Amino acid sequence: MSLSTPLFEGSRKLMWLGAGELGKEMIIEAQRMGVETVAVDRYDNAPGMQVAHRKYVVDMMDKEAIIAIAKREQPDAVIAEIEAINTSALEELEALGIRVVPNAKAVKIAMNRIELRRTAAEVVKVPTTLYAFAESPEEVKKACKDIGYPCLIKPEMSSSGHGHTVIYKEEEVDSKFEEAIKHARGKSRRVVVEEYIKIDTELTVLTYRYMTNGGVVTKVIEPVEHQRPQGVFH
């Protein structure tokens, strides 16, 4: 991307769908390179909006609203920064010739736990814990019996771990299934049931890609360990 002058005709422009703390940091870096920035989120005065050139407050699940903003702004690229986005809108933006980063297919898979699990375990063949998909308490009970208690239950789609619980015995299935559905994004009643494994630590491994000399380079950042005393990340 070539450098430009924000707010002038022909300026380079990026639009963020989601304007949280991560989006704010990205917007600041983009502005240092002379990029015009647009922040979109569901609530006003989100962190990214505090530094962006322009902001929009809309329901992030409103497909038509997202498309209308993109058509108005005509950004060089749209960046998906949060999980709660209408992924169909991203697909339509690509069809309109607007670049989406990451691409709409990748975002759709990453935001859907069933598609992500299938891609990781069945397509890429990454070793994972035992798992099953279910749409009713009866199917969850069968999955837990096959996998063995305790089990994790998660909504097909949600954000920030909402709706994740551990099922220790069959009597808990009905209530914890409803808990998962209550926090689900959209109208899906599908859940993922997973083998529960007690772990000593949790690592985040970040990858990033960039283009250079006509090619794409993929690199990995050193793993970051998380600690959660009293359930709070550190």
Give the location of each predicted region.
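ATP-binding N-terminal substructure of ATP-dependent carboxylate-amine bond-forming enzymes
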Residues: 1-106, 110-111, 138
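Active-site nucleotide/adenylate-binding loops and adjacent lid/helix of ATP-dependent enzymes
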Residues: 109-203, 208-234
